[in-house]
Amino acid sequence: MTLGRVFGVPLRADASMLLLTVVVTVLYAALARRQLDLGHLGGYLVGLGFVVSLLGSVLLHELGHALTARRYGIGVRGITLELLGGYTEMDRDAPSPKVDLLVSLAGPAVSAVLGAGAVAATMALPAGTLAHQLAFQLAVSNVVVAVFNSLPGLPLDGGRALRAAVWAVTRDRHRGTEVAGWIGRAVAVATVALVVLLTLRRALAPLALPLMLLVAVTLWRGAGQSIRMARIGHRLPLVDLARLARPLLPVPTGTPLAEAQRRRAEGATPDAALAVVDSTGRPVALVDPARVAAVPAERRPWLAVDAVARDLGRVPALPVDADGERVLETVRTHPGAQYVVTAGEDVVGVLHIADLAQLLEPKRKTNT
């Protein structure tokens, strides 16, 4: 759900944010009723007010990342508020360890400043008042966010800072990502241990238990994804489109699908990509394997290849000399099953995403 723009940055809210709103409102309402002697309605209104303030703090935290990234020329696709707080999407990675470090620490720095301001307000406001209670809880939440996010494990901000440090020392960004990913898994395990300890001591509210466990699971999965991407990164130098791309087998427009498949099966390259060509022999479309698979075998002799082909202009293109980083970035920004490989204005082959996946993750099962 799109909420608008803040400083030109698109702001969205995930549906899971509603769960966060309900859980925090209920937890804080119970606390407010005890501390301030409020009725049920008053407690829930105060709880909702705290949620709004908390989400405002999260937004400022993410704006710290976004505006710092833009300061160094990194485009920002948007900020999303969700169950576990929020995240900022950027259109590319940081160009250097220094920029990576500054962008990663900008969010916790904002939270630390907000926490310090809330601490000062707590000390200045009369105890036992609504304003004092809200200031105290905002101080606690922002300090916790600043400290927890600074832990040195991905996907936390501190993990990105650690990645930048390892990157600076080793000159290998992917090594930094892998190191920070493994430490992120350790942080996830430590979070579970903390949840168990607090539960045994009955120091954790019942509604907070599943939320903290969800945080731990999210950390574990995020760390695992970071480790996976680091391993992929180590294999990117192996990407050579001249060797990886499948050759083209031209078939004239109007050719029955079954006939085109027969020609390919009997040819020298049975894994070739079927390219529909016009009367001049120019490729105009690419047969889509997914569409072919959906056609029953008995219909294929009567169906022209044009019916299961995509116009070449609608298929993402890659120059044959593109390196692994560029190929991966294109795959991220233009997801698809096939990519046209070009040399100048000529189409020289087709990259199948399954072939790229097999090269980058040879132990991972893929569908061809």
Name every feature range the model reports, one short phrase each:
Residues 1-47, 89, 325, 332-333, ...:
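N-terminal signal-anchor transmembrane helix
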Residues 1-23, 43-101, 136-145, 151-165:
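Small-residue-rich helix-interface/hinge motifs
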Residues 5, 121-135, 165-180:
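Membrane interface segments of multi-pass transport proteins and intramembrane proteases
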Residues 10-20, 103-112, 177-189:
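Select subsegments of transmembrane alpha-helices in polytopic membrane proteins
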Residues 25-47, 120-140, 196-210:
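Membrane interfacial helix motifs at helix-loop boundaries and amphipathic/re-entrant anchors
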Residues 119-135, 200-229, 278-285, 289-291:
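Hydrophobic alpha-helical transmembrane segments and immediately flanking/interface helices
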Residues 139-228:
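Alpha-helical transmembrane segments and adjacent TM-loop junctions that form the membrane-embedded core
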Residues 226-249, 260-265, 272, 282-368:
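Tandem CBS (Bateman) regulatory domains
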